[in-house]
A protein has these predicted regions:
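Arg/Lys-rich, positively charged N-terminal/basic patches that mediate binding to nucleic acids
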Residues: 1-38
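Conserved phosphate-interacting/catalytic interface
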Residues: 41
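Residue-level marker of positions within ordered structural domains that often coincide
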Residues: 15, 46, 86
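Amphipathic alpha-helical interface surfaces
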Residues: 6, 30, 34-37, 57, ...
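Flexible, active-site-adjacent loop/turn segments at secondary-structure boundaries
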Residues: 1-3, 11, 48, 56-59, ...
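Enriched for short, Lys/Arg-rich terminal
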Residues: 68-105
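Short, surface-exposed helix-loop/turn micro-motifs enriched in polar/charged residues
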Residues: 2, 50-53, 89-92
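A short, surface-exposed loop/turn module that caps and links secondary-structure elements
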Residues: 45-69
Length: 105
């Protein structure tokens, strides 16, 4: 699956493991897990394949965040993303990563 990043800091975190913007500082364990989950998402052919990993807790969000999906980083953080299906088939899914959010805020 193809991954694009909506925010620059998300791409910086993935590429270099840190960000230049001090507003988005995370613990090293969170960053390592974030990179691991993004790599796992890239390896999968589509978002449906994420359901076989129970620890990710893949779900489509409801309410104010309807239209987004999420996977868990740990109990506190999740990656929120938009799914874009190209063509009639779900062959190529482009995930647009929108946020690394603190789940309970």
């Amino acid at each position: 699956m193809d991954i694009t990043f909506k925010q620059d800091y998300l791409q910086e975190l993935y590429k270099s493991g840190k960000t230049t913007d001090k507003k988005y500082r995370f613990q090293p364990a969170i960053i390592r897990k974030y990179i691991r989950v993004i790599n796992l998402m890239i390896e999968q052919p589509d978002t449906f394949s994420l359901t076989k990993y129970n620890s990710l807790n893949y779900e489509k969000l409801k309410g104010k965040k309807a239209g987004l999906s999420s996977v868990r980083i740990n109990d506190q953080y999740r990656i929120e993303f938009e799914e874009i299906i190209v063509g009639n088939q779900t062959v190529a899914t482009i995930c647009h990563i929108t946020e690394l959010s603190n789940h309970y805020q």
